[in-house]
A protein has these predicted regions:
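Conserved phosphate/anionic-ligand binding catalytic regions in large, soluble enzymes, centered on
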Residues: 48-61, 324
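N- or domain-start disorder-to-order transition segments that initiate the globular core
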Residues: 1-41
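Conserved, mostly hydrophobic/aromatic
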Residues: 52, 261, 328
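Active-site-facing alpha/beta catalytic cores
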Residues: 66, 79-244, 265-266, 270, ...
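N-terminal beta-rich core of secreted/periplasmic extracellular enzymes
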Residues: 25-39, 72-83, 89, 113, ...
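Short acidic, Gly/Ser-rich segments with clustered Asp/Glu that frequently serve as metal-coordination loops
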Residues: 54-57, 256, 264-270
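Acidic (Asp/Glu)-rich catalytic clusters
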Residues: 40-43, 70-77, 126-130, 213, ...
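Internal helix-turn-beta structural module
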Residues: 304-343
Length: 343
């Protein structure tokens, strides 16, 4: 047999009972969820900034980052909705490399999924408690989101997962916004089809149960660029791309048309400093066209305490990415204030 059982994992309800949320955290989440919903339904004109490390690799540095973000939030909350990006599981192009805190609570040690599910719940809970900001994470494994579904205020379905039926159907069960990224090919139709699926009701098997979902009216798109058959990056944040997306939304019966622009990945060709320019161009396009201003609800930025990235070894720099390169804190802070002025 090609698979062995390493450990029996607790059910989500059991983990939640062991690591419960305080009444204060529940109040924070309820308030922020309501404010974020108002942005996606058009009741609020605040601009969303989903910002944080490529991967949440260390509890201390991530919580320090989020606490710094909270201080910035105090100055921009009248214009912006800051959502910390706390990604605890990472898709890998070849399946090799660091797969996130869920797999490896300590990046330089062997995977331990039992310790991992505890570590990610503890991290998200601590981040909210210390900052007052609920976070975004990626739904890489649909069944595992049940360990965090009472904590998160935003989830994303990645470029390699967006065509997968289980991801689409699970997204239809969420009561928070879920961003469906364009696939690595860059195909807008595939992306919008995934939004349609996520907004619809479905009956399917989930964690050993026969379930029926209501559909998620806050499902929307995330533009992250694509690659052609020669692996050359194809950005999709330019004005013409946004107008094309607007036209395609018009031709589909979708609720609450909305888009988030991911300033990194194939939009920047992983040239992390380009995120500053890309965000500026997106803001210019929104301000130039009132319909785009209604469609483009926010941006996604990869940033950490220290800029760039590093290899996993014993001499790691605190607060520096061990996956894709990120903006450093000083650039991030300046960029957020600039967004608040221009959005």
């Amino acid at each position: 047999m090609g698979m062995k059982i390493n450990a029996e994992l607790p059910l989500p309800a059991e983990l939640k009972a062991e690591y419960p949320l305080s009444e204060e955290i529940l109040r924070i989440k309820e308030k922020r969820d309501r404010e974020i919903r108002d942005i996606f339904t058009g009741k609020s004109d605040k601009f969303i900034v989903i910002v944080g490390p490529c991967s949440a690799d260390n509890e201390e540095s991530v919580c320090e980052y989020v606490s710094r973000l909270a201080a910035v939030n105090d100055r921009v909350s009248d214009r912006l909705m800051l959502i910390p990006r706390i990604y605890t599981n990472k898709p890998r192009t070849t399946g090799e490399g660091y797969k996130g805190m869920l797999h490896q609570p300590e990046p330089d040690r062997e995977p331990n999924l039992l310790e991992g599910i505890i570590a990610i719940r503890r991290l998200h809970t601590r981040a909210i408690r210390e900052s007052g900001l609920t976070a975004a994470d990626e739904m890489l494994y649909p069944e595992n989101r049940s360990y965090l579904d009472d904590i998160l205020s935003y989830e994303a379905v990645g470029a390699r997962s967006v065509e997968n039926q289980q991801h689409r159907l699970t997204a239809s069960s969420m009561d928070i916004p879920v961003g469906m990224k364009n696939p690595t090919s860059g195909d807008f139709s595939v992306m919008l089809n995934s939004v349609k699926a996520a907004q619809s009701s479905h009956r399917f098997i989930y964690r050993g149960m026969d379930v029926t979902t209501d559909g998620n009216d806050l499902a929307h798109v995330i533009l992250r660029g694509g690659v052609d058959k020669y692996s050359k990056c194809i950005p999709n944040y330019h004005y013409e791309d946004l107008i094309r997306l607007l036209d395609m939304y018009r031709n589909r019966d979708l609720k609450n048309p909305a888009a988030i622009v991911d300033a990194n990945h194939s939009n920047s060709d992983k040239q992390f400093k380009e995120q500053i320019r890309i965000v500026s161009e997106v803001l210019h396009s929104r301000n130039y066209n009132t319909e785009l201003k209604g469609l483009i609800k926010g941006v996604m930025i990869e940033s950490y305490l220290e800029e760039g990235c590093q290899r996993i070894d014993e001499n790691r720099v605190y607060g520096k990415s061990i996956t894709d390169p990120c903006l450093g804190w000083e650039d991030t802070e300046r960029l957020i204030y600039k967004i608040a002025e221009e959005c």
